[in-house]
Amino acid sequence: MCNLLNIEKDPIRVLITGAAGNIGYAIAPMIARGIMLGPDQPMILHLLDIEPASSSLEAVKMELQDSAFPLLKGVIATTNVVEACKDVNIVIMIGGFPRIAGMERKDVMSKNVVIYKAQASALERYASDDCKVLVVANPANTNALILKEFAPSIPEENITCLTRLDHNRALAQLADKLSVPVSSVKNVIVWGNHSSTQYPDTNHATVSTKTGDRPLKELVTDHNWLKNEFIVEVQQRGAAVLRARKQSSAFSAAGAACDHIRDWFLGTPKGTWVSMGVCSDGSYGIPPGLVYSFPVICEKGSWKIVQGLSIDEFSREKMDDSARELAEEKDLAYSCLNV
């Protein structure tokens, strides 16, 4: 008799752009091992990068094949954006133009606008109807906004950007401060832009103790640290890694992207929220149309902004500062498009 438990799921097609880079190299085996979609979900990986990186891209494909991952049912490595986007279900957009010393913000923005406009158009035409997108490449929030503009058939709730790395950094800093496992800390919030204006908010965070969950602020009594050093440490952590390593964060970013997609698809634990960059609906006074990081809960492939949280005056100011920066980025991006 057929054992229904042994029926294999259909493979999910996952596109990684910028797949030959450091983050792409880190995330591909994580996905293939089942870290992102679970231990029973097969996948076919689509790897996209630019022509000058084609040799490195082929090497990533070879290493994936050589690893003999049971869940990996195929690898497509290409520099052709149409081939890369064909029938994909999940897109992780790591490819972008990094800011180089001496470049003006508008120069960087204009280059990324061109990249994301082209890739959005390809996804619009060739991706699966239920395609879900995570933008990692900076400026992540505004790149996601451009994607939304030029892929109008993709529901806006299916276009997100990565602030989970900032969220994870905040959890780690708090756990270190309290000398507890990072898994004991939950429900921090990263509001706003994935930039130095992001606001890591601890007002609603809790810590698991032997007697149950307790408000973090009862345990971290140095509230001055929470309002100053902690915030700056999270905001500047990426720059600190860059200074120390001479390269930007790679496997921590890859791991955060896996966390983001896993929770989106498989759901957040009951009573726990995470931070995701999503299209604002006006919640918490954030202007609609911006891609802004909110606290969300996820279930069955959908996310929902956590509502009803109290916002103090300090938080309001920080949240609005980041919203203003995102509005400026939006205007700058649209000026590059002449929209």
Curated annotation (Swiss-Prot):
GO terms for biological process: malate metabolic process; NADH metabolic process; oxaloacetate metabolic process; tricarboxylic acid cycle. Belongs to the LDH/MDH superfamily. MDH type 2 family. It is found in: Cytoplasm. CDD domains: MDH_cytoplasmic_cytosolic. One of its GO terms (cellular component) is plastid. Keywords: Cytoplasm, NAD, Oxidoreductase, Tricarboxylic acid cycle. Signal peptide: none annotated. Its EC number is 1.1.1.37. Expressed in rosette leaves at low levels. The active site is at 194 (proton acceptor). InterPro entries: L-lactate/malate_DH, Lactate/malate_DH_C, Lactate/malate_DH_N, Lactate_DH/Glyco_Ohase_4_C, Malate_DH_AS, Malate_DH_NAD-dep_euk, Malate_DH_type2, NAD(P)-bd_dom_sf. It comes from Arabidopsis thaliana (Mouse-ear cress). This is Malate dehydrogenase 3, cytoplasmic. One of its GO terms (molecular function) is L-malate dehydrogenase (NAD+) activity.
